[in-house]
């Protein structure tokens, strides 16, 4: 079954997560219209190869045209309009940047796959009694459901008792007025006095029964409000707080957050019960106005009951106003809470009280740093204005599940300029990527005579003015959400708390697993721990400061740990994603471990790891070989950076890599990917066939072109290159490269510099095993 069809069969909570994957940058309508074609393309490859991305993008436009023709035949005006608008947007946004749309689509497809896996796992675990976490959660939810049912039942029981009291009071009122009327009209003789006393006794008995029932109802109302308070505290302080914490974790790459639908149903049910109870308390006031007496419990307790129920309802409504989707730039979906000035970002708020009468009644206004203006000025932080559509009315039509929400899609930030370039205080102690800002959402609710001011805010965001600030800004978001669940601590980085390696390790692994199919292994994390903390045996519980993580340079390096790691993450996502997902890249491994595992392997065995000396991120391969005397040697090639991988895929580099031996013969030192996977089996499928790379010659051409192939070559010695069959210009480049190579990374055995050149495939090259 197609992936898109499987997704549409998921539960509502998963469909809401699916909805959150899509935005204007890649509309869900397009995913729906072209589902089979989209799933048939290799978007991951297109995201790493610009020429292929351009081809796929133009094919996408062609598919849109074909679909438009179908809608034209069906006279579907709405779909025609939407598809035309989508095509115009894609052309304006991605025509010059086709790799961006490829990355976005690849990311969406991968997230869809993860969503299906999560749903399948949850379905399997749902029936397993031996799964402790699932059992605890289910039991807790069942208890909450029981408490809510109990509240609803008590409300209904009170409703019946109120009717009984009202009937009894009407009888009492009628008999009392009748007796009074008869007493005024008749002479009070002996017989009449006896009858009157008898009727008075009956009235006293009725009043006693009425008083008992009133006291019972007042007591039950007080108990009901206490039960509501308990359920409300469980919902807001536990369930909703847990959801908000999970949202924080999901923002920094952790497991996806659960859907709000169930929580919305619980809160809505409680709110309905509270409003019904408030009406019952108002009914008590009506009863009091008809019949009152000395010691009336309604007079004594009704004002307090009214105050309690109103306070409960107000607090519930305020807690139910949440940010369902945190601020995020559509072009950087994997890094929410970082906003660049002048670039649109999106966010979504939701009211978890689903009252149809509130549809299109709540106007939401957005502002930034509403409550921290004075603090921001003291800290020297920048100030911003929100531009774009910063007001919107909540409605139930825009959400798939009919929730009361408002999505802001066209917000931007602009810095308020002042005389010193925007900083309110030149002596500010925080750098801009450590400044935290809050985006606030406000509205007013008028419901059943109550006016309630609602306000919620986003998690703290970092505002940047240049995309080069993204790495440090994202580090701030990671550190904040890793170490605190305080949603408003904008002064967090004035004295940032210390984290433990266990916390940092989990978050670092999330940075890979959230954007790829593979997190970090224990061995890879141990290597990273050594980079941060130095040699050790057990890093559990070791403390890591914010400065150590992000600001201080690593020992012997001119850059910090996070800058180095973030560039590797970017390298993986953009250039070697498929190889990483396959598990072919060992990545983080110490030199000692590298030598230990390779030295026992046959010559030609190699592994792939990340460069430790390249600030911009580099990947290299290390292999084992035997020298003339039979001694084992470990060799590493100079790391390949993003600039080189833009021109040739890493798989093609590995498949074509050669060493020029002393006799000027090209040989391949790479045979088996560790531990024993044949190179062709591992990387062959990621190399484009030569028939696609070299178009056939024009039959009418007098002299057909010779086919060429780009390969990477490492000369053993520059003096031995004079006999290599290549052009003088290529030879000069090779000589210059061999004499002037810089920035090489030392290895245990030796260091090799490689040159990529274009070799003619003619008879002179027959001795080269290509």
Swiss-Prot record:
Residues 580-670 form the SH2 domain. The modification Allysine is found at residues 601, 615, 631, 685. The modification Phosphoserine is found at residue 727. A motif (Essential for nuclear import) lies at residues 150-162. The keyword Transport does not apply. The modification N-acetylalanine is found at residue 2. GO terms for molecular function: chromatin DNA binding; DNA binding; DNA-binding transcription factor activity; DNA-binding transcription factor activity, RNA polymerase II-specific; protein dimerization activity; protein homodimerization activity; protein kinase binding; RNA polymerase II cis-regulatory region sequence-specific DNA binding. It holds the Pfam family STAT_alpha. CDD domains: SH2_STAT3, STAT3_CCD, STAT3_DBD. Involved in the gp130-mediated signaling pathway. Belongs to the transcription factor STAT family. This is Signal transducer and activator of transcription 3. It comes from Sus scrofa (Pig). The gene is STAT3.
């Amino acid at each position: 079954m197609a992936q898109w069809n499987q997704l549409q069969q998921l539960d509502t909570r998963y469909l809401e997560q699916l909805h959150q994957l899509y935005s204007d940058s890649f509309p869900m309508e397009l995913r729906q219209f072209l589902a089979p074609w989209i799933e048939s393309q290799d978007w991951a490859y297109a995201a790493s190869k610009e020429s292929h991305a351009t081809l796929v993008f133009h094919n996408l436009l062609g598919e849109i045209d074909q679909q438009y023709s179908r809608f034209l035949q069906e006279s579907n005006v709405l779909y025609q309009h939407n598809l035309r608008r989508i095509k115009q947007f894609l052309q304006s946004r991605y025509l010059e940047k086709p790799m961006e749309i490829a990355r976005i689509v690849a990311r969406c497809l991968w997230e869809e796959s993860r969503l299906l896996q999560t749903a399948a796992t949850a379905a399997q675990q749902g029936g397993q009694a031996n799964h402790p976490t699932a059992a605890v959660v289910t039991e807790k939810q069942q208890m909450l459901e029981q408490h809510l049912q109990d509240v609803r039942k008590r409300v209904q029981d009170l409703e019946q008792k109120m009717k009984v009291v009202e009937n009894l009071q009407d009888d009492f009122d009628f008999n009392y007025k009748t007796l009074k009327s008869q007493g005024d009209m008749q002479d009070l003789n002996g017989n009449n006095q006896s009858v009157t006393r008898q009727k008075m006794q009956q009235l006293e008995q009725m009043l006693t029964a009425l008083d008992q029932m009133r006291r019972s109802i007042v007591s039950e109302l007080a108990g009901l409000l206490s039960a509501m308070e308990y359920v409300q505290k469980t919902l807001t302080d536990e369930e909703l707080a847990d959801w908000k914490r999970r949202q924080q974790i999901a923002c920094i790459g952790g497991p996806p957050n659960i859907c709000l639908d169930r929580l919305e149903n619980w809160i809505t049910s409680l709110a309905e019960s509270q409003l019904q109870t408030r009406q019952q308390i108002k009914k008590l006031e009506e009863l009091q106005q008809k019949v009152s007496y000395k010691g009336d419990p309604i007079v004594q307790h009704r004002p307090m009951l009214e105050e309690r129920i109103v306070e409960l309802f107000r607090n519930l409504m305020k807690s139910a106003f949440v940010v369902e989707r945190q601020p995020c730039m559509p072009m950087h979906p994997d890094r929410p809470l970082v906003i660049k000035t002048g670039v649109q970002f999106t966010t979504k708020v939701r009211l978890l009280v689903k009252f149809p009468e509130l549809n299109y009644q709540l106007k939401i206004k957005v502002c930034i740093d509403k409550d921290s203006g004075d603090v921001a000025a003291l800290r020297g932080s920048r100030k911003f204005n929100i531009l774009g559509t910063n007001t919107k009315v909540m409605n139930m039509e825009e959400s798939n599940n009919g929730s009361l929400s408002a999505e802001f899609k066209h917000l931007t930030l602009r810095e308020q300029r002042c005389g010193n370039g925007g900083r309110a205080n030149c002596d500010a102690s925080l750098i801009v990527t450590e400044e935290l800002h809050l985006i606030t959402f406000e509205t007013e609710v008028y419901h059943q005579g109550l006016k309630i001011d609602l306000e919620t805010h986003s998690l703290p965001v970092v505002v940047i003015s240049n995309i080069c600030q993204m790495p440090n800004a994202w580090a701030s978001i990671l550190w904040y959400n890793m170490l605190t669940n305080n949603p408003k601590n904008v002064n967090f980085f004035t004295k940032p708390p210390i984290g433990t390696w266990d916390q940092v390790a989990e978050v670092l692994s999330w940075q890979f697993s959230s954007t790829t199919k593979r997190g970090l292994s224990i061995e890879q994390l141990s290597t990273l721990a050594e980079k941060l903390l130095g040699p050790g045996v057990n890093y559990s519980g070791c403390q890591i400061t914010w400065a150590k993580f992000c600001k201080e340079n690593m020992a012997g390096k001119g850059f910090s740990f996070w800058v180095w790691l973030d560039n590797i993450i970017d390298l993986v996502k953009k250039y070697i994603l498929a190889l990483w997902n396959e598990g072919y890249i060992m990545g983080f491994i110490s030199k000692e471990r590298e030598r230990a595992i390779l030295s026992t392997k046959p010559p030609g065995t190699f592994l792939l790891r990340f460069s430790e000396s390249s600030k911009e991120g580099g990947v290299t391969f290390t292999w084992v070989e035997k020298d003339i005397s039979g001694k084992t040697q470990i060799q590493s090639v100079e790391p390949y950076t993003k600039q080189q991988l833009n021109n040739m895929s890493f798989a093609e580099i590995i498949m074509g890599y050669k060493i020029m031996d002393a006799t000027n013969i090209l040989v391949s030192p790479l045979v088996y990917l560790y531990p024993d996977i044949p190179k062709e089996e591992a990387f062959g499928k990621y190399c484009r066939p030569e028939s696609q790379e070299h178009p056939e010659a024009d039959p009418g051409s007098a002299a057909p072109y010779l086919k060429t192939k780009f390969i990477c070559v490492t000369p053993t010695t520059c003096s031995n290159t004079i006999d290599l069959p290549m052009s003088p210009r290529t030879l000069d480049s090779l000589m210059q490269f061999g004499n002037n190579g810089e920035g090489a990374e030392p290895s245990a055995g030796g260091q090799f510099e490689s040159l990529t050149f274009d070799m003619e495939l003619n008879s002179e090259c027959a001795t080269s095993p290509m």
